[in-house]
């Protein structure tokens, strides 16, 4: 079942190694679950079959044999139908995303959770997103987290026609190793800064005008909130100094967040 959902991720070099290792781990776990049940079910069937043979109910035995279905087969059929529907949807979306004058957004994700006995739970997550805009503009985001291996990584790519700048970050929470790599497609490393500026300028052409007014209003509201917090601080600093200072800090943090530009790359540290 997992292989059906993850086939598209396995074709991507960013995900392939982790997905292959995780799929093998899932197969071993499912095999350990199914084999004991399979032996028990076979032994029960044998005992029942011998009893029915002694009683002479051969027809009933044959009908039971024909209707005996693995408990996983029904789920497999359901997942196969779901996969076929998703593939058809992706094909239709692929035709739309090829329109050079259109906007499009696509997103795919998969997650597995397993827990055996007293062992800590194992969580595997992967997601990919693609945004497109006219003029050959594209942004890609990929992320993966594997609690079993401790690996967390993500990649953000900015594309203009056949040029691209991709930043990849990874961290292993078990070993503490961290790595940052940059990939330059059809350009040199020295051109990265100019390319990033060009990409940002192209994106600004498609920003809704109201977004800038909303941003200005947000700044004004935060400044007014900060001023009122300052007055409140003066009135209460003798009796409630710590809460007032914390209130002012929250206002300053909110104002600082408004100055963020572009598409930042973050790694969640635990």
Curated annotation (Swiss-Prot):
Phosphoserine modified-residue sites: 6, 8, 32, 34
Pfam families tied to this protein: Mlf1IP (PF10248)
Location in or out of the cell: Cytoplasm; Nucleus; Cell projection, Cilium; Cytoplasm, Cytoskeleton, Cilium basal body
Region entry Disordered, spans: 127-148, 221-247
Keyword Nucleus: yes
Presence of keyword Cytoplasm: yes
Comp. bias intervals (Basic and acidic residues): 138-148
Molecular functions per Gene Ontology: DNA binding
This protein's GO CC annotations: ciliary basal body; cilium; cytoplasm; nucleus
Segments of this protein annotated with the region Interaction with COPS3: 50-125
BP GO terms, sorted: DNA-templated transcription; myeloid progenitor cell differentiation; regulation of cell cycle G1/S phase transition; regulation of DNA-templated transcription
InterPro entries in alphabetical order: Myeloid_leukemia_factor (IPR019376)
Predominant localisation class: cytoplasm
Domain of life: Eukaryota
Subunit architecture: Interacts with CENPU. Also interacts with NRBP1/MADM, YWHAZ/14-3-3-zeta and HNRPUL2/MANP. NRBP1 recruits a serine kinase which phosphorylates both itself and MLF1. Phosphorylated MLF1 then binds to YWHAZ and is retained in the cytoplasm. Retained in the nucleus by binding to HNRPUL2. Binds to COPS3/CSN3 which is required for suppression of COP1 and activation of p53.
Similarity comment text for this entry: Belongs to the MLF family.
PANTHER family: MYELOID LEUKEMIA FACTOR
Function (record text): Involved in lineage commitment of primary hemopoietic progenitors by restricting erythroid formation and enhancing myeloid formation. Interferes with erythropoietin-induced erythroid terminal differentiation by preventing cells from exiting the cell cycle through suppression of CDKN1B/p27Kip1 levels. Suppresses COP1 activity via CSN3 which activates p53 and induces cell cycle arrest. Binds DNA and affects the expression of a number of genes so may function as a transcription factor in the nucleus.
Protein name: Myeloid leukemia factor 1
Organism encoding this protein: Bos taurus (Bovine)
Gene that this sequence comes from: MLF1
